[in-house]
Design a protein with these regions (language model features):
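Eukaryote-skewed repeat-based solenoidal scaffolds used as protein-protein interaction platforms
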Residues: 1-79, 86-89, 99-106
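Terminal, non-catalytic domain-edge segments
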Residues: 5-16, 41, 88-155
Length: 155
């Protein structure tokens, strides 16, 4: 990596992503915020350090705004991921009921699992079979159960 020519990294692209307001940049920001929290929890295994909780709460507030302002453009998977992160941080979301209402209308016609049909990002056959919906359904279950980390004393 250190021997890679500098021309292979284009920071202008990163700048455009960070400052643009396209649908894709919104999704990338949402993904970035949720995965910062998931990483800080060491993939759900530890509590967030109290000293860091304020900044992760800011990230959740920003993520919540992205979802609220673009509700039909954000996948059900991303909404559940946000709820999982809110649970990790003890954040009370003002849009949780809206997300759960969408979930209540998203049961697959041929099985007892959740599919994504109410969003602009939903595709007729993209992740709407049992195997393709696994990640979404795991996130839903995680968002609806208490966060019980293995390590309750984060370092």
């Amino acid at each position: 990596y250190l021997r890679t020519p500098a021309s292979r990294v284009n920071p202008e692209k990163y700048f455009r992503i960070g400052t643009s307001s396209t649908d894709e940049s919104l999704k990338l920001r949402l993904y970035f915020f949720t995965h910062c929290i998931i990483g800080a929890s060491k993939f759900y295994s530890t509590k967030i350090r109290q000293a860091d909780l304020a900044i992760y709460t800011k990230m959740l507030h920003a993520a919540e705004s992205i979802i609220r302002d673009n509700f039909r453009k954000i996948s059900l998977d991303n909404k559940f991921e946000f709820l999982v992160c809110a649970k990790i941080c003890g954040y009370i979301s003002g849009i949780e009921e809206l997300i759960l209402s969408e979930a209540s209308h998203s049961l697959a016609p041929d099985g007892n699992f959740l599919i994504d049909t109410e969003n602009e990002t939903a595709t007729p056959d993209g992740g709407n079979d049992f195997v393709g919906a696994e990640h979404r359904n795991v996130l839903y279950i995680m968002s609806q159960t208490p966060f019980r980390p293995h390590d309750t004393n984060p370092s």
